Amino acid sequence: MKIKLVVVGKLKEKYLKDGIAEYVKRMGTMLPLEIIELADEKIPDNASEKEAEALKKREGDKILSRIQTGDKLAILAIQGKLMSSEELADFVKKAEVYGTGNLVFVIGGSLGLSDEVYKRSDLQISFGRMTLPHQLMRLVLVEQIYRAQMINRGSAYHK
């Protein structure tokens, strides 16, 4: 099994790239992490609700094209389930032991995720009700994936 992180938008800030690279390096071959960046749709100024939904659908189609049949899909959503690091570790462990494909985490674009992505998801995770920049959220998620692996291996990293 591999863990994939499918994200809408490019990472621009060097300090975030460096932080993510550090955690990816630490994971090494334990449970490889692949990050797939998808181009975000350009949102016109004063976009109508219909235009915004069409953009979300296009981004959703791009996301779903990266998900395979046996993959376990976890999406980040404000209204999702609040989880502790231990609960996330348990989810990762179960996907590793019982899964038939890869474990895929998704961070959508600034408009959110399409209904189709929500319907395909196996788990909706919330990191709280606060709004965070998607680029920062990527670093936080990668750290939590690393932490989950350390918990599952009994490492002292998680105290």
UniProtKB/Swiss-Prot annotation:
Keywords: Cytoplasm, Methyltransferase, rRNA processing, S-adenosyl-L-methionine, Transferase. Gene3D superfamilies: 3.40.1280.10. GO terms for molecular function: rRNA (pseudouridine-N3-)-methyltransferase activity. InterPro entries: Alpha/beta_knot_MTases, RlmH-like, tRNA_m1G_MTases_N. One of its GO terms (cellular component) is cytoplasm. It catalyses: pseudouridine(1915) in 23S rRNA + S-adenosyl-L-methionine = N(3)-methylpseudouridine(1915) in 23S rRNA + S-adenosyl-L-homocysteine + H(+). It is found in: Cytoplasm. It comes from the Bacteria. Its main location: cytoplasm. S-adenosyl-L-methionine binds at L76, G108, F127, G128, R129, M130, T131, L132. Its EC number is 2.1.1.177. The keyword Methyltransferase applies. Homodimer. Belongs to the RNA methyltransferase RlmH family. Specifically methylates the pseudouridine at position 1915 (m3Psi1915) in 23S rRNA. This is Ribosomal RNA large subunit methyltransferase H. It comes from Lactococcus lactis subsp. cremoris (strain SK11).
